[in-house]
Amino acid sequence: MSAKCPICAKPVDSAFRPFCSKRCADVDLQRWLSGRYVVAGGDDDEENPPSQDINRE
């Protein structure tokens, strides 16, 4: 069983794994950059912002 490209379903090329080509890798990157793909976060992500006292000792 060979792996298939998640963009076009062609066999994967090890040079571009997990994609079959640079084109499919670029299509995937553009989808991330345009906001088409997102990683869901919990509601508490905005309620607990990072501390502003990072450099404080």
UniProtKB/Swiss-Prot annotation:
Disulphide-bridged cysteine pairs: none
Residues that hold Zn(2+) according to the record: 5, 8, 20, 24
A Gene Ontology BP annotation from the UniProt entry: regulation of DNA-templated transcription
SUPFAM superfamilies hit by this protein: Glucocorticoid receptor-like (DNA-binding domain)
GO molecular function, one term: zinc ion binding
Keywords linked to the UniProt accession: Metal-binding, Zinc
UniProt xrefs under Pfam families: YacG
Co-factor binding comment: Binds 1 zinc ion.
Superkingdom to which the source organism belongs: Bacteria
UniProt-listed Gene3D superfamilies: Erythroid Transcription Factor GATA-1, subunit A (3.30.50.10)
Cofactor: Zn(2+)
Subunit-level organization: Interacts with GyrB.
Family: Belongs to the DNA gyrase inhibitor YacG family.
Function: Inhibits all the catalytic activities of DNA gyrase by preventing its interaction with DNA. Acts by binding directly to the C-terminal domain of GyrB, which probably disrupts DNA binding by the gyrase.
Name the record gives this protein: DNA gyrase inhibitor YacG
Organism: Caulobacter vibrioides (strain NA1000 / CB15N)
